[in-house]
């Protein structure tokens, strides 16, 4: 059946004849000079043909430059997120379809046969074949120097390592002894495991292929310690920071100044429309790096053509005013897919043993949650338009339970104080601050990424109500990367961030992210490290309910009954709501999306979510175009 669905997706595409392929004007000179082959030779034998009419979209005109902003140099990786070329991808209804793949076959949810598109090429024109998967498998993840930890955890099911075979140039087979039903959704993620590599490019940095003396010279010039470090530095399809690394994304990194990155259309991209016009429609993406605090102002000033990253609900008023004052843009309001707009994460792996014991007591976490005036925060920061409550599945998810949203989430200072008293935290300083068991004042430090004014404003309100509990809140803004590293190391007492990326789960969604399987869940970084490294780092979970979450996640992977999976999901969500590992404050506040008035095929409504959906990715940014692209050129 899964094979049939994949093939039907292919057959439903509109007919296309190779001789109708239209050459893009952007690469016309290179084609005329012989530096590039003509369009018919650059496309796969069977390209992915987009049916614009079926999607309710219009055919576009090639050309123009899309301007967007990011706040950090490393955010060039957003081009891989937005571009969203994946082996399989999510459609807007969250069904999976073959994208880079021509099709796929699934047998018993444990054997996956991936069929590549004959004639598909990397951005430098080299064939994309099963050899690129072989290189990843044999020469990267199974090379002890490049990957000391061995194959990634998704290749193991029930402790058994899967196999990867390569029957021919256009077929790759992944197989496990038992079902691995999360394999395809994993490939469709915003930040997927890239299970292929441009072997023809990377071999020059690999000891098994490169000439020893020339490789040693490359290592010296790159100022790294080993050939493996050099290989890893050159090889990152997600970071997108090596312009020489071939890609399959719609745009390729053309470098540029450090503060202004340029990306130009991939001449070998595999998607076309029914007229034979190669996507993406837009020729160039100009990504400018600015201070996070300037993004809204620059959007208001008309310096972007497409922007949502770096914009928050409080920016809507200034954006709408600029629009009404004659700005050449529209401000769309999309839904937000994160499980919580703002969530506080007490670190259960904090290295201070006294504080760690306090935070591991569920009464403390419940008291913190009941000491938050969510209604005041909603009215003050979101004009009452957000949903007040804890972190759980959003209202549009079939797994949403209103009881989980409200669990321990109603302001009740009296009850919160009673819980803290029950813990024995009855001693007070002259200023009324409770004392820890060792006599220290209860000063609760929450570290932030310092990027969102709404977070700091919310914490200012929380400070006042927590003071009534005898808890002094101290806010510490940090750089995002420093914050993450402190949390992972166990030196951060608590952090504030969004809720789960995926607030829209279905029973078919893997619930692993609700269990201690990843250090990126700030409540249990050490437990996540333990799972991710198979016990070589971090700490094993040593609390009852987190262990139960691990068991439930494992149970989910061993059943394929939707009803049973739903039962598992609901128990896991109930545990989170009851235990308050992450203390959600608000959710579902509208996400502003600034769009040039000249841009077409942009959805009026959508969901802004990293996972699933890759932000703009699921909405196919390669199909966006300008009404008059000649007016949209880079300066």
What is each model feature region?
Residues 29-33, 37-108:
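N-terminal lobe/hinge region of extracytoplasmic solute-binding protein
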Residues 53-81, 100, 183-192, 355-357, ...:
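A structural "hinge/loop" feature
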Residues 153-230:
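Surface-exposed binding/hinge segments that line
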Residues 63-72, 102, 111-115, 136, ...:
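Short, well-ordered beta-strand elements
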Residues 102-147, 183, 298, 358-360:
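Aromatic- and charge-enriched surface segment that lines or borders ligand/interaction sites
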Residues 245, 251, 255-261, 265, ...:
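Detector for C-terminal structural segments
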Residues 117, 238-242, 268-320, 366, ...:
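Ligand-site clamp/hinge motif
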Residues 140, 145-150, 164-165, 252-268, ...:
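Extracellular/periplasmic solute-recognition and catalytic clefts
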């Amino acid at each position: 059946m899964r094979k049939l669905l994949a093939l039907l997706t292919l057959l439903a595409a509109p007919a296309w004849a190779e001789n109708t392929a239209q050459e893009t004007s952007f690469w016309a000179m290179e084609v005329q000079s012989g530096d590039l082959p003509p369009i018919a030779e650059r496309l796969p034998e069977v390209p992915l043909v987009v049916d614009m009419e079926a999607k309710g979209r219009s055919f576009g005109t090639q050309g123009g430059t899309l301007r967007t902003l990011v706040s950090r140099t490393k955010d060039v990786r957003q081009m891989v997120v937005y571009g969203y070329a994946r082996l399989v991808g999510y459609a807007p209804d969250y069904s999976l379809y073959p994208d880079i793949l021509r099709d796929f076959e699934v047998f018993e949810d444990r054997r996956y046969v991936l069929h590549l598109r004959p004639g598909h090429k990397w951005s430098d024109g080299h064939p994309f074949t099963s050899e690129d998967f072989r290189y990843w498998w044999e020469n990267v993840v199974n090379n002890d120097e490049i990957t000391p930890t061995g194959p990634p955890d998704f290749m193991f099911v029930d402790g058994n390592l899967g196999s990867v075979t390569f029957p021919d140039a256009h077929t790759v087979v992944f197989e496990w002894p038992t079902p691995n039903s999360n394999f395809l959704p994993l490939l469709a993620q915003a930040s997927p495991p890239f299970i292929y590599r441009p072997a023809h490019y990377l071999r020059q940095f690999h000891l098994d292929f490169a000439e020893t003396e020339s490789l040693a010279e490359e290592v010296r010039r790159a100022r790294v310690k080993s050939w493996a470090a050099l290989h890893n530095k050159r090889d990152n399809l997600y970071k997108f920071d090596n312009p020489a690394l071939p890609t399959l994304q719609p745009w390729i990194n053309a470098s540029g100044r450090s503060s202004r990155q340029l990306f130009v259309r991939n001449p070998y991209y595999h998607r076309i429309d029914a007229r034979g016009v190669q996507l993406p429609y837009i020729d160039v993406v100009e990504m400018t790096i600015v201070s996070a605090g300037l993004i809204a102002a620059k959007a208001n000033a008309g310096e972007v053509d497409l922007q949502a990253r770096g914009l928050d609900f409080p920016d809507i008023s200034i954006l709408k005013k600029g629009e009404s004052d004659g700005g050449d843009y529209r401000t769309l309001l999309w839904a937000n897919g994160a499980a919580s707009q703002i969530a506080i994460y007490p670190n259960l792996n904090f290295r201070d043993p006294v504080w760690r014991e306090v935070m591991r007591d569920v009464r403390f976490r419940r008291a913190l949650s009941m000491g938050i005036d969510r209604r005041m925060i909603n009215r003050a920061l979101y004009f009452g338009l957000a949903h007040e409550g804890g972190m759980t599945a959003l209202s549009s998810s079939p797994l949403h339970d209103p009881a989980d949203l409200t669990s321990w989430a109603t302001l009740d200072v009296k009850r919160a104080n009673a819980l803290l008293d029950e813990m024995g935290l009855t001693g007070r300083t002259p200023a009324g601050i409770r004392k820890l068991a060792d006599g220290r004042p209860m000063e609760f430090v929450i570290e932030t990424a310092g990027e969102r004014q709404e977070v700091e404003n919310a914490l200012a309100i929380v400070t006042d109500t927590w003071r009534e509990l005898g808890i002094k809140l101290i806010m510490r803004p940090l750089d995002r990367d420093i914050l993450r590293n402190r949390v992972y190391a166990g030196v951060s007492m608590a952090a504030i961030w969004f809720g789960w990326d995926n607030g829209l789960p279905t029973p078919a969604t893997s619930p692993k992210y609700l269990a201690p399987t990843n250090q990126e869940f700030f409540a249990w970084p050490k437990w996540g490290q333990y799972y991710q490294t198979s016990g070589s780092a971090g700490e094993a979970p040593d609390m009852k309910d987190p262990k139960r979450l691990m068991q439930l996640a494992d149970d989910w992977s061993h059943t394929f009954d939707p009803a049973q999976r739903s039962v598992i999901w609901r128990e896991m969500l109930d545990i989170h709501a009851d235990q308050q590992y992450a203390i959600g404050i608000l959710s579902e506040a509208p996400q502003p999306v600034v769009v040039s008035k000249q841009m077409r095929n942009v959805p009026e409504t959508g969901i802004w979510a990293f996972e699933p959906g890759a932000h703009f990715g699921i909405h196919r940014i390669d199909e966006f175009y300008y009404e008059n692209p000649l007016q949209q050129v880079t300066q």
